[in-house]
Curated annotation (Swiss-Prot):
Signal peptide: none annotated. Keywords: DNA-binding, Metal-binding, Nucleus, Repeat, Transcription, Transcription regulation, Zinc, Zinc-finger. GO terms for biological process: regulation of transcription by RNA polymerase II. GO terms for molecular function: DNA binding; zinc ion binding. This is Zinc finger protein 208. PROSITE patterns: KRAB (PS50805), ZINC_FINGER_C2H2_1 (PS00028), ZINC_FINGER_C2H2_2 (PS50157). GO terms for cellular component: nucleus. It is found in: Nucleus. A zinc finger (C2H2-type) spans 173-195, 201-223, 229-251, 257-279, 285-307, 313-335, 341-363, 369-391, 397-419, 425-447, 453-475, 497-519, 525-547, 553-575, 581-603, 609-631, 637-659, 665-687, 693-715, 721-743, 749-771, 777-799, 805-827, 833-855, 861-883, 889-911, 917-939, 945-967, 973-995, 1001-1023, 1029-1051, 1057-1079, 1085-1107, 1113-1135, 1141-1163, 1169-1191, 1197-1219, 1225-1247, 1253-1275. Its main location: nucleus. Residues 4-75 form the KRAB domain. The keyword Transmembrane helix does not apply.
Length: 1280
């Protein structure tokens, strides 16, 4: 039995029979015939469409269709297209024009007689084609028609004519609507259906209607998933036999259809036809909506669906709808995971053959599609089409939401997701949803850890082939894209997209578009949460994570989760420590190629990004963007907690950690935690000590390149960041930012413990440690702990004596750059920071900040032990050591311990004698900057600190504070024992010792104990005789620098401190202050024994020794003891006979400066101290004090032996010697002894005959001043 044919299942009607059928019966006939044909198609029997089916599909009557017209095979075949040519019966046949429906270009000479047909010529071009059909037809139906010299057999002449039309290419049939021509009536009919939208065949499943039943059948297979046609080679199944036929060509590799223009071959004629359009550029199919033209009608149909918004093809798995059935089939492969098309080169598999074809170009490198405008070649026509739009600027696809235009529909589709927020692709592992399937596929690899693309060099696996390709370049250094102009090869190659604004070029047009937004400021992507806009959708996507806090990317090693896959990938390298990207200059390796590229700019100095505002250039575009915000003042990122705004989102994120207190990054070395991984990375360098960035000027090395760049500005003096308020310039932007707070006064960082607010987060962090007392950084040398690593590093220099910072002016070196900066201000005299209250200027902002406290009086730092408050934390820290007795800083020379390093530094100068601070006015040198600063005021006479009560001005704030207490009589420090109040805590501390009698400071030499360490130190010098401070004028040595300074004033005669009351001048401000108390009459220090009051506590202490009889200071020469060290010093001169104080008037020399001062008054007759009772004047205040007793008759000093009272302690002391018989002062000439040194002095004159006191009136000379004074009264008439 032969094969089943369409004729076996077809029914024929004559005209009479057809007219007997009603409309329903005629429709039934049509449906049955079409259904029978579809079944044959489904079984693979019908290889082509009979004319009957064509007419029935077109709705035409078939009553005169004859039997031979219902067969599905012709005796004649054109092997060029493997298309049978159907014979027809009569020349008058109404269907004579409907014969050859698909192809137009076979010549008659290409026809041949199929097997069993003896009277038909063979087609001489394609001899192999006829064997592909199995069906046969009897030769009795043949009839020969001659055409020229060819014997081509047709059933009708019309068939021959129609076949000839195909070879000639003539198109006689024209569409009046679109002015398009066709060679066949069937083609014209098909064309008409496109714009009339005849859709007779409806799908019951999806409701969609089609023009042709075959299309409906194909569509239904999308719903059922039915694929009855299977490939024997690879097992892949297809829904249509024709698709299987096309598919088979893949395995054979046969490409019989060649393009005459470029020589490229194809395995299907349809593909060749499409290809030819590239050369002709013909686009006859135009869209009525937007005017866009297409080369294929199918593309036009697909395009129209864009305007209609129609998406009839729905996926049962996820519900997503598509406008084309082919897209739905491709989509289904996502769910099935099916990838039957494998690349023989690299083994990669694909879901579609077209994708495999595109992929193969990667291996061949072929680029057949060339742009006529710029000559650029591409691998695929779609890329060329996309490229051409760059030149035309065409963007036909408009977004209805925002009006934005796009060059491709696919880009529009992706863009629309932004507005809808639709994320149909969901991850089954973690539930995360994506806008596009490609994103989901990439995401899945996170969970699977799949890395199918292996590097043959190092074995490393990658999740994407593109990443593997990039990776390979590391090993081979391959640069496949070579420029014909300059022979230079690069990895990325050509950058044809140039910005007209700034000239920057890009590889891709998308990059250029994004770049242009920098100039236009366009930010089309808006965040619905906070309203912030972004220039790219990807940045918006990343931004959204800030609001959701979602972290779907988890590290399998340590469990840490991240917001973005890129961050996870970067994090994973921490565990692997892989750094494949190496710098050829310095050998440093990096885990990302982008970081290597940025790193290389350190060596090249390249800064391609320029700021148009100030001309400053940057190595990174991100840095330029951040910099621009400085000019714009834009701070779009706001903190919801405190309202503070920031220029960068990263800064906001860092800021948020302040409120949250979150510190997830922990250091394995020391356990310290950090809020950011980058800070942890920087911290780790402390433990490794690695410093790869070296300064070529001074050789100093740094941990980070940014620090090196900042350091270089020290040498260059570059200060690119300028303050608009005051014009001051800074070397770094961060310092400028901090500086600006000075002008605004803003303090956004608040302490939750005590409520104190700060300008900077760093200050708050430092402040918090006061409450926690946390000190994680410990010194290995001495065990001292610190709350900041920076302080520990500075502290270590004490032990190493490292001083890397050198002053170019004077050569002095410093351990800290801040100290060097402060020191430089001495040479420059620069004081840019001015106090608004009093106008005083300072060289550092920190000093100005400290100074301001004087005006506010604020004391936020309180001691928990005693309740005392301080203005600065450093003072509190220093104070605390009083309670602990801690003295960690030891002097290597003498072993003495100090509570602060600064005090140790000052102390060390005693041993070295170094005096680096020199006064330009008088040439005087000083060991310390503070003393030097005070000295300068001597010349300038500047007094910035003014008392509001009396208008008096002072040079230092401490003196003003002390002075103010005179007006307020403020004595806040009360002692509970006696109720007495004191103006300062230090005086209270000293006072307490009186009640406790405590003397903790003991001399190891003689066992004597003292109340204060300073007294013990003074005392020790008695035993050691240490006098390290020597006078260059007279070689006299002193135990203390203050004594030497006082002594020098003797030689210089310098007395810059003058009393405004009486005009008296003093060498020292302390002496002037003491003197002023004389005028004020202020005597706050009262003796509890006798009620006597004193100006100074030291005077009271000396006075008390009268009552106690204490004389701690002993003369080693004669054994005599004294109540004060100063009296002992004076006494020692008796034994040495030294008289360093010489009178310039008469040449007389004295042992003490006080005696010289008293002597000088003889020449001037100056008596500034007047008695208010009698008006008498005196040369010294002490004499006035003694004189006053005459008027009061007061006798405070009583002898315990006999009860006799005296006005002065000296008289009492003299009196006591009557009872004791003590006469310690012996005359070396005659051996006579005296009870007082003054009597001995007077006695000595007998032996010398010296008479220094001469009367100017009569010329008489006297040995003693008292006798001389009495003699003067003879001439004046004054009563003796």
């Amino acid at each position: 039995m032969g094969s089943l044919t369409f004729r076996d299942v077809a029914i024929e009607f004559s005209l009479e029979e057809w007219q007997c059928l009603d409309t329903a019966q005629q429709n039934l006939y049509r449906n049955v015939m079409l259904e029978n044909y579809r079944n044959l198609v489904f079984l693979g029997i019908a290889a082509f469409k009979p004319d009957l089916i064509i007419f029935l599909e077109e709705g035409k009557e078939s009553w005169n269709m004859k039997r031979h017209e219902m067969v599905e095979e012709s005796p004649v075949i054109c092997s060029h297209f493997a298309q049978d040519l159907w014979p027809e019966q009569g020349i008058e046949d109404s269907f004579q024009k409907v014969i050859l429906r698909r192809y137009e270009k076979c010549g008659h000479e290409n026809l041949h007689l199929k097997i069993g047909y003896t009277n038909v010529d063979e087609c001489k071009v394609h001899k192999e084609g006829y064997n592909k059909l199995n069906q046969s037809l009897t030769t009795t139906q043949s009839k020969v028609f001659q055409r020229g010299k060819y014997a081509n057999v047709f059933h009708k002449c019309s068939n021959s004519n129609r076949h000839k039309i195909r070879h000639t290419g003539k198109k006689h049939l024209q569409c009046k609507e679109y002015v398009r021509s066709f060679c066949m009536l069937s083609h014209l009919s098909q064309h008409k259906r496109i714009y009339t939208r005849e859709n007779s065949y409806k799908c019951e499943e999806g409701g969609k209607a089609f023009n042709w039943s075959s299309t409906l059948t194909y569509y239904k297979s999308a719903h059922t998933g039915e694929k009855p046609y299977r490939c024997k080679e690879c097992g892949k199944a297809f829904s249509k036999f024709s698709i299987l036929t096309k598919h088979k060509v893949i395995h054979t590799g046969e490409k019989s259809y060649k393009c005459e223009e470029c020589g490229k071959a194809f395995n299907q004629s349809a593909i060749l036809t499409k290809h030819k359009i590239i050369h002709t550029g013909e686009k006859p199919n135009k869209c009525e909506e937007c005017g866009k033209a297409f080369s294929k009608v199918s593309t036009l149909t697909t395009h129209k669906a864009i305007h209609a918004g129609e998406k009839p093809y729905k996926c049962k798995e996820c519900g997503k709808a598509f406008s084309k059935v082919s897209t739905l089939i491709t989509h289904k492969a996502i769910h099935a995971g099916e990838k039957p098309y494998k690349c023989k080169e690299c083994g990669k598999a694909f879901s579609k053959f077209s994708i495999l074809t595109k992929h193969k170009v990667i291996h061949t490198g072929e680029k057949p599609y060339k742009c006529e405008e710029c000559g650029k070649a591409y691998k695929w026509p779609s890329t060329l089409s996309y490229h051409k739009k760059i030149h035309t600027g065409e963007k036909p696809y408009k977004c209805e939401e925002c009006g934005k235009g796009f060059s491709m529909f696919s880009i529009l589709t992706k863009h629309e997701v932004i507005h809808t927020g639709e994320k149909p692709y969901k991850c089954e592992e973690c539930g995360k949803a994506f806008n596009w399937s490609s994103n989901l596929m990439e995401h899945k690899k996170i969970h699977t850890g799949e890395t199918p693309y292996k590097c043959e060099e190092c074995g490393k696996g990658f999740s994407m082939f593109s990443i593997l390709t990039k990776h390979k370049v590391i090993h081979n250094g391959e640069k496949p894209y070579k420029c014909e102009e300059c022979d230079k090869a690069t990895h990325a190659g050509e950058k044809p997209y140039k910005c007209e604004e700034c000239g920057k070029a890009f590889n891709w047009s998308s990059n250029l578009m994004e770049h242009k937004r920098i100039h236009t400021g366009e930010k089309p992507y808006k965040c619905e949460e906070c309203g912030k806009s972004f220039s790219t959708f990807s940045i918006l996507t990343k931004h959204k994570v800030i609001h959701t806090g979602e972290k779907p990317y988890k590290c399998e090693e340590c469990g840490k989760a991240y917001k973005w896959s890129s961050t996870l990938s970067y994090h994973k390298k921490i565990h692997t420590v892989e750094k494949p990207y190496k710098c050829e200059e310095c050998g440093k390796a990096f885990n990302q190629s982008a970081i290597l590229i940025k790193h290389k700019r350190i060596h090249t100095g390249e800064k391609p990004y320029k700021c148009e505002e100030c001309g400053k250039t940057f190595s990174k575009v991100s840095t330029l963007t951040t910099h621009k915000a400085i000019h714009a003042g834009e701070k779009p990122y706001k903190c919801k907690e405190c309202g503070k705004t920031f220029i960068k989102v990263s800064t906001l994120t860092t800021h948020k950690a302040i409120h949250a207190g979150e510190k997830p990054y922990k250091c394995k070395e020391c356990g310290k935690a950090f809020s950011k991984f980058s800070i942890l990375t920087k911290h780790k360098v402390i433990h490794t000590g690695e410093k790869p960035y070296k300064c070529e000027e001074c050789g100093k090395a740094f941990n980070w390149s940014s620090n090196l760049m900042e350091h270089k500005r020290i040498h260059t003096g570059e200060k690119p960041y300028k303050c608009e308020e005051c014009g001051k310039s800074f070397s770094t932007f961060s310092v400028l930012t901090k500086h600006k707070v000075i002008h605004t006064g803003e303090k956004p960082y608040k302490c939750e413990e005590c409520g104190k607010a700060y300008k900077w987060s760093s200050t708050l962090s430092y402040h918090k440690k006061i409450h926690t007392v946390e000190k994680p950084y410990k010194c290995e040398e001495c065990g001292k702990a610190f709350n900041r690593s920076a302080i520990l590093i500075k502290h270590k220099r004490i032990h190493t004596d490292e001083k890397p910072y050198k002053c170019e002016e004077c050569g002095k070196t410093f351990s800290k750059v801040s100290t060097l900066t402060t020191h430089k201000a001495i040479h420059a005299g620069e004081k840019p920071y001015k106090c608004k209250e009093c106008g005083k200027a300072f060289s550092k902002f920190s000093i100005l900040t400290k100074h301001k406290v004087i005006h506010t009086g604020e004391k936020p730092y309180k001691c928990e032990e005693c309740g005392k408050a301080y203005k600065w934390p450093s003072t509190l820290s220093y104070h605390k050591k009083i309670h602990t007795g801690e003295k960690p800083y030891k002097c290597e020379e003498c072993g003495k311990g100090f509570s602060m390093f600064s005090i140790l530094t000052k102390h060390e100068v005693i041993h070295t004698g170094e005096k680096p601070y020199k006064c330009e006015e008088c040439g005087k040198a000083f060991s310390w900057l503070s003393v030097f600063s005070k000295h300068k005021k001597t010349h300038a006479g500047e007094k910035f600190y003014k008392c509001e009560a009396c208008g008096k001005a002072y040079k230092s704030s401490s003196t003003l504070s002390y002075h103010k207490k005179i007006h307020t009589e403020e004595k806040p420090y009360k002692y509970e024992e006696c109720g007495k109040g004191f103006s300062t805590f230090s005086i209270l501390t000293k006072h307490k010792v009186i009640h406790t009698g405590e003397k903790p400071y003991k001399c190891e030499e003689c066992g004597k104990a003292f109340n204060w360490s300073s007294n013990l130190m003074e005392h020790k010098k008695i035993h050691t005789g240490e006098t390290p401070y020597k006078c260059e004028e007279c070689d006299k040595a002193f135990s203390w620098p203050s004594s030497l300074t006082e002594h020098k004033a003797t030689h210089a005669g310098e007395k810059p401190y003058k009393c405004e009351e009486c005009g008296k001048a003093f060498s020292w401000p302390s002496r002037l202050t003491e003197h002023k108390a004389t005028h004020a009459g202020e005597e706050p220090y009262k003796c509890e024994e006798c009620g006597k009051a004193f100006n100074w506590s030291s005077n009271l202490m000396e006075h008390k020794r009268i009552h106690t009889g204490e004389k701690p200071y002993k003369c080693e020469e004669c054994g005599k003891s004294f109540s004060t060290f100063s009296i002992l010093t004076k006494h020692k001169v008796i034994h040495t006979g030294e008289k360093p104080y010489k009178c310039e008037e008469c040449g007389k020399a004295y042992k003490w400066s006080s005696t010289l001062s008293y002597h000088k008054k003889i020449h001037t007759v100056e008596k500034p101290y007047k008695c208010e009772e009698c008006g008498k004047g005196f040369v010294m205040f002490s004499i006035l004090a003694k004189h006053k007793v005459i008027h009061t008759g007061e006798k405070l000093y009583k002898c315990e032996e006999c009860g006799k009272a005296y006005k002065w302690p000296s008289t009492l002391r003299y009196h006591k010697k009557i009872h004791t018989g003590e006469k310690p002062y012996k005359c070396e000439e005659c051996g006579k002894a005296f009870s007082t040194f003054s009597i001995l002095t007077k006695h000595k004159v007998i032996h010398t005959g010296e008479k220094p006191y001469k009367c100017e009136e009569c010329g008489k000379a006297f040995s003693w001043l008292s006798v001389f004074s009495k003699h003067k009264k003879i001439h004046t008439g004054e009563k003796l």
